[in-house]
Every structure is written in C-alpha cells, then in structure tokens.
Amino acid sequence: NHYMTDPVRISIGQKNSGTANVRHIHYLIRANDRYLALKRFIDYTPSIYGIVFCRTKLETQEVADNLIHDGYNAASLHGDLSQAQRDLVMNHFRQRYLQILVATDVAARGIDVSDLTHIINYNLPDETAVYIHRSGRTGRADKTGVCLSLIHSREKHKIKAIEKQLGQTIERAMVPSAKQVCEKQLFNHIDRLEK
C-alpha cells in the first residue's frame, strides 16, 4: 500500500495523565465528617468555582440540597433532572450565578466550563482514569486549578494507584480549622473592601 510507506504518529497529550497546572490534595477524614469537611473547605475558599463529584444521584441531590439549605450558592446535576432542568442549571453555572455544581460523572459528561478553580471528589472514583478525567476539568489554558479529594481510611489504597497514573504525588493536608476559616474570610473581606 503506497499510502502507508512512511507513516507518522501524532500524539496530543498523554492518555490518562494529569495536567501540570493542577495541584492534587487529599484530606483524610472520618466518613461521617465528609459533608462538614466539604463545607469547611468551601468556607475556606470564598472565590471557589467548582464541581463536587458524588457517586450516586441520591448522594448528589442530598449534598446539593444540604449546601443550598446551609446558604451556599449550589445546584445539582444528575440523571433524574429533565433536559430543561439540566440546561437551566448549566446556564446558571456557566454564568457564575452558581459557585458549586454537585454532579455525578455521567451527568457531567460532555460539559465544558471554563475557569474552574476546583474539582472536589466527595468520594474517590473506583477507576483512576475517572479521577484523571475529573481533575482535567480544572487547570486549563495556562490557568492553575486544585483537585481535592475527601477520603477515609478505606480509600487510602486508591491514592497510590492514582499517584502512579498521574506521575505525581497527591499532597495530604488537614481540613482547615474554624479559626483558619475565619481568618481567611476576614482577609478576603478586607481585600474586597480595599478594591
């Protein structure tokens, strides 16, 4: 075949590799403290614009409902929503009327949102490729992003597999204390007043 005499292979990026612009962090928590840790992190990051990934539609709705009830600018995105509801949620999220989108992986497929600051794994996915795909939604176009995971002791073994696939270490950090949250919010408020 005269077409394949000197083939050239072109590769764009590496399959299932993380971006260098994303900082990966995990927080080791008790399973019962997962929601409180999420709230603490959101409070610590007032300018957050991100997606919280949950395992199930039910968990997605519960987390979003709890965030809304607690005064956060959030909404859910999952398969039980009608197409009109999904479109409305995505429109509000893209226009930044919402800071937090709580979603399942299936519902979030194909959505493309610019300038996400954070991806939060409320639960680690079972497959490392899903983690890579989730984290790749932030840190795009020369911007930096953060992918954080709330894990409990039964999920610790997954971190090593993800690190191997990423080719980098996932930092371990402590959930911010109430004092740290207050200080951060105070400094953020002062910065806004000075502008």
Task: Please report, for each region that a protein language model flagged, where it lies by residue.
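Conserved helicase RecA-like core
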Residues: 1-195
